From Swiss-Prot:
GO biological process, one term: phosphate-containing compound metabolic process
Species for this entry: Methanothermobacter thermautotrophicus (strain ATCC 29096 / DSM 1053 / JCM 10044 / NBRC 100330 / Delta H) (Methanobacterium thermoautotrophicum)
Protein name, UniProt field: Nucleoside kinase
Assembly and binders: Homodimer.
Binding residues for substrate: 16, 42, 46, 110-112, 166, 249
Protein EC: 2.7.1.-
Amino acid sequence: MSEDRDLLAVGHTAFDYIIHLDEFPEPNTSTAIKRMRNLHGGAAANVALVGSRLGLRTSLVSAVGGDFEGSEYRELLESSGIDIESMILVADESTPTAFVMTDSDHNQISYFYWGAARYFKDAETPADAIKSARAVHLATGDPSFNCRCGEFARSLGKIISFDPGQDLHMYSRSQLERAVGVCDILFGNHHEIDRICSKLSVDIHGLREMGPGVVVKTYGKEGSIIYSDDVIKIDAIPREAVDPTGAGDSYRAGFMRAYLRGADLKTCGRFASAVASFIVEDEGTQTNIPDTGEAVKRFTAQWGYEPPI
């Protein structure tokens, strides 16, 4: 089967409730919601959609409920050129739903209803979708399903990136070893990468020895650090942040866009930072996605040269 897709994203497609508060309430208390919006999200869908807007041919494997059929969200993904033929439909379940709370300091707490995603673990490995992609991104989702997808992709020599995100706590040590062991690029925020190292009893050097030649550790507005044979510090592009939700997923999509075009790691990180800087300027994960030209323009304004991508 020919590789007619650049990037397959595996993991959650979700309906998001983005909720803003002044501060998180203590147990047994309440607090006022300043504003709330019902938007589209899910880490895998975010990566697929941002990647598509950046010119990648993307595909998506998620478990969705009957409410996804005929929805505006399905229409959006299809009209964006994303291949969703391998989506797992659980007709009598609801599509996963995220409730993302953000305080005035942009700290976040998320509550996630798995719904149809509970059926990931029993689903068949999406062999055709993996075969048809040059690279596979394992996003938040069921650990056993992600491990199976990663191992099948590795057997075919695919490029694999892995970002367990907020589902990291669901991985056993054995599952984490399997997923880390098959990936080329490991993404995580600094809390997550530190937890992964702790869970596997390794430092960054030991983590890279387990599989990923590249480990990307993000720090929000403080930027990111790329660990490979070198250690590369990437600055975040200063913007007026409205909502940080989805910035990490867009960073990963931007990074993979540059990486799959053969860019060096510093350019990958800088392009990722440029893409993410758009997402924080509006509420939600998919409301302010740049195209390649817009991201390149912001990259050039920040770093003084046009990226060779």
